[in-house]
């Protein structure tokens, strides 16, 4: 029998995941929303132990709405009656949206406090910082925005502890110091520095550029850029231009990818930056590495779709050709 409204691949995967978790009798499961929240297939849980909302930006605007308030309303769909939601405190512009939803549902609203992130030390191995009463937390993820994410994690763990889960400070510190997230301000190499980052919208690019300026002050960056045609390409280019020494253009492996030649032409029209279009990701990675000086910083970004191939090509290129230079 053929269903009139067939489930999507993501819905089938969600159902498979639920079955697997039930069979394994998991004590605690973390479900990540695919897109939005209110209508997402993961949102079948009646009242989770905690709902978590990180920073909100303008992305998937066709599906979720064209303002931060509309997107926040969709994200807020995971807030359930009598539940608890932890929200990144940097979402000040849309916090009233979450407050209104919590008033309506009787949910408890907990916010992180980014302003209480202090005594920050940045290094290639990660970040050290204080948060509220916790001193010298070691975070293995690089990118200054990751400390905001860590603050949300800390508040979430405290909520779970109040619900009876035994976690403890030692486990918290261990988790922060060992967490690994490929493709998020990930350093694949030093001398030259090669970074790969999955930022794919203006807010993501802003966060990436803030981290680049923090880690590499007064330094121009050689970008390897591939973006989907559905994204706000012009705004992303405007943001990147002041920091760019050079832009190499690639096409992400997606039918929605912006054509590399067309994008290179757009960059030439809109930006005063040397630009090269590459026929493949492999060619782009190889060229950027072969033409780099040891002190250069290469940053591959623009799409999550490109990350796996970029990482594979870069690691292979450095392994074959880099001799005595420093690998991570």
Region spans (language model):
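ATP-dependent carboxylate-amine ligase catalytic core
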Residues: 1-46
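Nucleotide phosphate-binding/pyrophosphate-handling subdomain across enzymes
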Residues: 24, 28-31, 39-52, 56-61, ...
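Conserved catalytic-core segment of NTP-binding enzymes
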Residues: 37-39, 44-106, 233-234
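Beta-strand->loop->alpha-helix junctions that form or flank phosphate-binding loops
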Residues: 88-89, 101-123, 140-144, 171-178, ...
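C-terminal helical cap/extension that packs against the catalytic core
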Residues: 91-110, 124-125, 193-194, 202, ...
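Acidic-glycine-rich active-site phosphate/pyrophosphate-binding loop
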Residues: 121-135
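Short, flexible loop segments at boundaries between secondary-structure elements
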Residues: 253-254, 319-328
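Active-site-proximal loop/hinge segments that shape catalytic or ion-binding/gating pockets
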Residues: 303
